[in-house]
Amino acid sequence: MGSRFLLVLLSGASCPPCPKYASCHNSTHCTCEDGFRARSGRTYFHDSSEKCEDINECETGLAKCKYKAYCRNKVGGYICSCLVKYTLFNFLAGIIDYDHPDCYENNSQGTTQSNVDIWVSGVKPGFGKQLPGDKRTKHICVYWEGSEGGWSTEGCSHVHSNGSYTKCKCFHLSSFAVLVALAPKEDPVLTVITQVGLTISLLCLFLAILTFLLCRPIQNTSTSLHLELSLCLFLAHLLFLTGINRTEPEVLCSIIAGLLHFLYLACFTWMLLEGLHLFLTVRNLKVANYTSTGRFKKRFMYPVGYGIPAVIIAVSAIVGPQNYGTFTCWLKLDKGFIWSFMGPVAVIILINLVFYFQVLWILRSKLSSLNKEVSTIQDTRVMTFKAISQLFILGCSWGLGFFMVEEVGKTIGSIIAYSFTIINTLQGVLLFVVHCLLNRQVRLIILSVISLVPKSN
């Protein structure tokens, strides 16, 4: 009725100058073009200062992309790309406009007509529903689409949720409801292993940080790298334990997700520098070469160690700030955004694997020619343990995460998941054991400190 009344009032008027993304209709009024809606919410208007804003079909549920199709908003419409069906191409789909008719439902076009007629009379339909649930649920605002015989999110958006109440906003009137999407079910055993393993790692990392800071005789380029890696791992694991499930408020959750993104990328960047330093140290066994390369790297390792993650986070936050925070305070797994983390990690793991096997090859060929001081290490078991542990300290074991897909099957997937969790949560323990407890100088310092402690009678 409000819409008809407005048309009657405008029937005798001439069409005014229409703003950008609007056109004249019936020579009497302006209306926003398909894919746009007026900022005021009105369908018809005379005011040339009115703004026609792009409708984000991907976020509002108006897009008609098929299941697993990639939805990407663009000015005045959207595109659907089926590249997302193939895991390896997710990141590619996020940076190019690969559009294909088969990716749409019923080959529909990538534009959406503004369905906000009810706003003409000043009505802004909203509804709320008390719903039980925890922080790890997702509330979806829907209405019943009789022609399709199912629920639809078209024209409805989620406004706010707390522990017991959900508020929605829709641009039309119908029979509304709130669907509760439960978070993916967690394996309770894996959860316990993660919490216990990370707690032990935090203790070992704290002791390692104290060792690298206080033991002056061992302070050099190597210990600087170990210290920065230990700091990043300590902060990342601590934030993971305390903040990964703090999904409310959403802004805080997004900040936590961004910090975790930065800290874990920084961890892997320092692992890369560790691998590079290990390779150069083994290749240049002479003291003079070792010293010169150490001084050279020390000048650049801090800008590289923290600069590269900062650049990646800045670009990710600019491109998709809404992709931080899901059922947990981490990155969204759809639309290829997760590759802003997995991409750099995959590259670093591959590079460190190359460094690791080159180091083994060099040591194998030069072991007999090492100087007398180094050759005094005759315990083969200790050397073997150090060599294997170094593979995990360099982060290569994180590569198991790339094989945690449905195609491997439930049994193999469980084995990979448990191996991944146990090994990587104990990375801090291995770092402390290899670089502190198995370091002869550190052991001598610890023994000297213990000897100074007065014994009680």
From Swiss-Prot:
Annotated keywords: Calcium, Cell membrane, Disulfide bond, EGF-like domain, G-protein coupled receptor, Glycoprotein, Membrane, Receptor, Repeat, Secreted, Signal, Transducer, Transmembrane, Transmembrane helix
GO cellular component: extracellular region; membrane; plasma membrane
InterPro entries: EGF-like_Ca-bd_dom, EGF-like_dom, EGF-type_Asp/Asn_hydroxyl_site, EGF_Ca-bd_CS, GAIN_B, GAIN_dom_sf, GPCR_2-like_7TM, GPCR_2_EMR1-like_rcpt
GAIN-B domain segment(s): 134-186
Top-level division of the source organism's lineage: Eukaryota
Extracellular side: 16-191, 245-250, 321-336, 406-413
Annotated stretches, region: GPS: 141-186
Molecular-function GO terms, alphabetical: calcium ion binding; G protein-coupled receptor activity
EGF-like domain: residues covered: 15-53, 54-104
Record: glycosylation sites: 26, 106, 162, 245
SUPFAM superfamilies: EGF/Laminin
Annotated site residue numbers, Cleavage: 173-174
Membrane-side (Cytoplasmic) residue stretches: 213-223, 272-299, 358-384, 435-457
Family classification: Belongs to the G-protein coupled receptor 2 family. Adhesion G-protein coupled receptor (ADGR) subfamily.
Subunit structure: Forms a heterodimer, consisting of a large extracellular region (alpha subunit) non-covalently linked to a seven-transmembrane moiety (beta subunit).
Function according to Swiss-Prot or TrEMBL: May mediate the cellular interaction between myeloid cells and B-cells.
Protein name, UniProt field: Putative adhesion G protein-coupled receptor E4P
Organism name: Homo sapiens
